[in-house]
Regions:
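Residues that define the transmembrane beta-barrel architecture of outer-membrane proteins
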Residues: 1-4, 37-45, 78-84, 114-118
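Residues on the lipid-exposed face of transmembrane beta-strands in outer-membrane beta-barrel proteins
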Residues: 6-12, 27, 45-51, 86-90, ...
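Transmembrane beta-strands of outer-membrane beta-barrel pores
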Residues: 12-14, 25-31, 51-53, 68-74, ...
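Short loop/turn motifs that connect adjacent beta-strands in outer-membrane beta-barrel proteins
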Residues: 15-19, 53-62, 93-98, 128-135
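Transmembrane beta-strands of outer-membrane beta-barrel proteins
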Residues: 19-25, 45, 62-66, 84, ...
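A mid-sequence, solvent-exposed acidic-amphipathic segment
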Residues: 23-57, 61-63
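Long, repeat-rich segments with strong aromatic
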Residues: 56-62, 69-77, 86
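Outer-membrane beta-barrel "beta-signal"
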Residues: 115-135
Length: 135
């Protein structure tokens, strides 16, 4: 299944509390013939709050955060799904431009029909160097 997901994003670092926030709102359009698919288009919104901790002489970092996720299918009479995603992002190399994110997505409602999901992502800030540089 292919989705087209345009979205608006906003982020802010709050120096007084040394935390960051990030928010998104968007629309997920499922590509293909509507009669051939078993999911509908949906609205989604996400908000994450976290803080980066620096350790050691060379500034290794760990970034724990919590994300709140909502999504609502269009065209179905189903309730909005709300989830919470505690997660952490850690650098994999010394240059810290390749990072691994790990989290678990827990449903806050409709949990009788929805299970928690383990999630992971790899982030490469290519401006700071090639993927295999800085290890």
């Amino acid at each position: 299944m292919t989705k087209l997901e345009p979205y608006l994003a906003w982020g802010q670092i709050w120096p007084l509390w040394d935390v960051f926030t990030h928010a998104q709102v968007g629309y997920a359009h499922v590509m293909g013939n509507p009669s051939d698919r078993d999911v509908n288009d949906e609205w989604f919104w996400r908000t994450a709050v976290g803080r980066t901790f620096t350790f050691g002489r060379f500034g290794r970092t760990v970034t724990p955060m919590v994300e709140f996720v909502g999504q609502e299918e269009i065209g179905r009479n189903t309730p909005t799904e709300w989830d919470v995603v505690p997660q952490v992002q850690i650098p994999l190399n010394r240059r810290q431009h390749v990072r691994l994110g790990l989290g678990v997505r827990y449903p806050l409602n409709n949990y009788q029909t929805r299970d928690h999901r383990y999630m992971a992502y790899l982030l490469w800030d290519w401006f700071d160097g090639g993927f295999f540089e800085g290890w």
